[in-house]
């Protein structure tokens, strides 16, 4: 006793009792959400390069999982940075300077040294005795000269 309309409305018939007046009513049909379609992400990559006649340059590239940017002066010195996503999913960021003194880098992926300064090495009793005997001999030789 329920008719679904192709236009998004549904209708109900009047009451079957001859003694009760029931007007026709309508209500919107339930909305059925179509199945979602998975769309692969689009990998957008860009790159740039600009250089003047004396060798100064700015260049780099960016894509979904890595980026690199650098500037170079006329003497060939470079300052730049790059980043990428490691296989573990960590974003690795690196800044660098390359000049006449070498390649200098700062990165969140470099090993970190110990925070506590190690205790000085203490000579064993045998080493201390050998050093004392050696210094005594050195003083004897100095006295002869």
UniProtKB/Swiss-Prot annotation:
One of its GO terms (molecular function) is structural constituent of chitin-based larval cuticle. Keywords: Cuticle, Repeat. Residues 41-114 form the Chitin-binding type R&R domain. GO terms for cellular component: chitin-based extracellular matrix. Coiled coil: none annotated. This is Cuticle protein 7.
């Amino acid at each position: 006793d329920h008719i679904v309309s192709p236009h998004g409305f549904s209708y109900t018939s009047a009451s079957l009792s001859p003694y009760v007046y029931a007007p026709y009513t309508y209500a919107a049909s339930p909305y059925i959400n179509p199945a979602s379609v998975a769309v692969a992400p689009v990998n957008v990559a860009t790159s740039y390069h600009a250089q003047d006649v004396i060798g100064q340059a700015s260049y780099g590239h960016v894509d979904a999982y890595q980026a690199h940017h650098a500037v170079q002066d006329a003497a060939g010195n470079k300052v730049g940075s790059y980043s990428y996503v490691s296989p573990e999913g960590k974003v690795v960021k690196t800044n660098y300077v390359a000049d006449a003194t070498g390649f200098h880098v700062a990165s969140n992926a470099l090993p970190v040294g110990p925070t506590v300064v190690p205790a000085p090495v203490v000579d064993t009793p045998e080493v201390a005795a050998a050093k004392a005997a050696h210094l005594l001999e050195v003083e004897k030789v100095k006295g002869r000269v």
